[in-house]
Regions:
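Alpha-helical transmembrane spans
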Residues: 46-118, 245-322
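Phosphoinositide-dependent membrane-docking surfaces
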Residues: 129-130, 140-166
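Juxtamembrane amphipathic/hinge helix adjacent to a transmembrane helix
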Residues: 40, 213, 220-262
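Short, hydrophobic/proline-enriched secondary-structure or compact coil segments at domain edges
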Residues: 38-53, 176-178
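Short, non-transmembrane cytosolic segments of multipass membrane proteins
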Residues: 1-37
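Short acidic, Gly/Pro-enriched loop/turn segments at secondary-structure junctions
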Residues: 163-176
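Membrane-cytosol interface motif
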Residues: 122-137
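Canonical phosphoinositide-binding patch of PH/PH-like domains
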Residues: 177-216, 222-233
């Protein structure tokens, strides 16, 4: 259940809960979801958002759409001769149905193949700036979807949880996401929002991630859990087990299993039993998507600016203002 109403306006339609303010006392140990840290030093923390998108779903359903479209065209050709009077109306609307099929197939395939392999977020604690690598996408698959970088002042950001839920025919599923909200200074009027972490079945890891970011920006990496850089190599084995990592028979799977709590074992086992028929094909689609997806390329000036230390703050501020 949502906890009342958000303090921020306008409220997001999927809003669930406002999280503690940036400078509020910590009520939990700060930690990140395993594998979500790309890099961290005394100046910059780079957080991966690769796990937020369920890559492979568009490939799987896109290929099914293509197969269905081919079947539809073949069936239309078979019934053209001889042409019966009661087939005139279905044949008249068949071009529209075919066009819709092409649009859906292209949209699903492009969504998976064009979005970069990651959309990282950099927190620069010395400049108190947040750099968000974004890729715009929409409903027109034939239009170019640009990649942009948004820059926010840390002191204008707050956090909130969003929730989406529904019934998939077999089970009731809910997913939570952590969003950062930029407000006008001294107000709760929202200027912009961006998703920091998403696609989580529970809230605990998102609370921990917000605590981790707050601690890093105020105190640096000292005292924070240190994680190895996220594995970024693309292999068929890693993609195949992307959504059921605990079943991976290699060392990576053993590491995942070693960190799982009893409740996570129960939850993951239920998901595996109910959805393996979808998640393994999605893993194959994930491999195809990651092979074709563009790599992350920060604009050179933003890349340098987001890594700069305190001696460059004036120069960075001048560049942003200009």
């Amino acid at each position: 259940m949502a906890k009342g109403e958000s303090k921020r306006v306008p409220e997001h339609p999927h809003w669930y809960e406002d999280l503690p303010e940036r400078d509020a006392p910590l009520d939990r140990a700060p930690k990140m979801v395993h594998g979500d840290v790309n890099a961290m030093d005394a100046i910059c923390l780079e957080i991966s958002r690769a796990s937020t998108l369920m890559r492979g779903l568009g490939i799987a359903f896109g290929l099914v759409s293509v197969a269905g479209l081919i079947f539809f065209v073949v069936m239309i050709c078979l019934v053209l001769f001889p042409l019966e009077p009661d087939l005139i109306v279905p044949l008249a609307i068949s071009p529209l149905l075919a066009a819709m099929g092409v649009w859906i197939a292209f949209l699903l395939l492009k969504t998976d193949l064009s979005i970069p392999r990651d959309r990282p977020v950099r927190l620069n604690r010395t400049q108190r700036k947040v750099y968000v690598y974004e890729h715009a996408y929409g409903m027109n698959p034939f239009k170019k979807w640009p990649t942009t970088v948004k820059v926010f002042d840390w002191d204008t950001l707050q956090a909130e949880l969003h929730r989406q839920a529904g019934f998939n025919g077999k089970a009731y599923i809910q997913r939570f996401s952590l969003w950062l909200v930029s407000c006008k200074p001294g107000t709760n009027e929202v200027v912009d929002r961006f998703e920091l972490k998403g696609n989580h079945p529970t809230r605990a890891e998102l609370y921990d991630a917000w605590a981790y970011c707050r601690t890093y920006m105020e105190h640096g990496p000292e005292g924070l859990p240190v994680y190895p850089p996220r594995r970024q190599e693309v292999t068929f084995r890693r993609s195949f087990f992307e959504y059921l990592r605990f079943l991976d028979p290699t060392e990576e799977g053993r590491e995942e299993r070693a960190q799982m709590t009893a409740s996570e074992w129960i939850l993951n086992s239920i998901v595996a039993l109910l959805a393996f028929w979808l998640l393994f094909p999605m893993g194959i689609g994930h491999y195809i998507a990651m092979r074709f997806a563009p790599e992350v390329k920060w604009p050179p000036e933003i890349d340098a600016e987001s890594r700069r230390g305190p001696s460059h703050r004036a120069e960075a501020a001048s560049a942003i203002g200009g």
